[in-house]
Amino acid sequence: KTFSFPLGYAEPFNIQHYKPGEGFFSWHCERGMHQTHQRALVFMTYLNDVTDGGETQWLYQGKEMKPKKGLTVLWPTDFTHTHKGVVSPTQSKTIATGWYNYLDVRAIAG
C-alpha cells in the first residue's frame, strides 16, 4: 500500500556518501534545533549494500539495520529514536535521507 504527503510537508531529501572509515557515528536525533523543530518523521533509503559495518543503530530500541540497496526505513524524529551510523572500515555507504513535517515548510519559509 502506498501513501502520500501533501506537497510542502516533505523537505527535499539529501544524498550522503561516506567513504570507508567515514560516517555520522555520533548519537543524534532529527529534531530539536529551531530549523528542525517541525520535523515529524525521517526516512532513509540505502543506495548500496554494505556487508562490513555500515549499520544504523537505534539507542533506546536496541535495534540495528544492515544496509541493503533499496531498503527504506522510516522512524520518528524525536529523542525517543536517537540513532547513529556504524562506520564501515572497508566499504563506502550511500544513503538518501528526507523528512516529513508537522507543518507546510513553504509557509514557514515565508
Language model region names:
Residues 1-72, 80-110:
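Fe(II)/2-oxoglutarate oxygenase catalytic core
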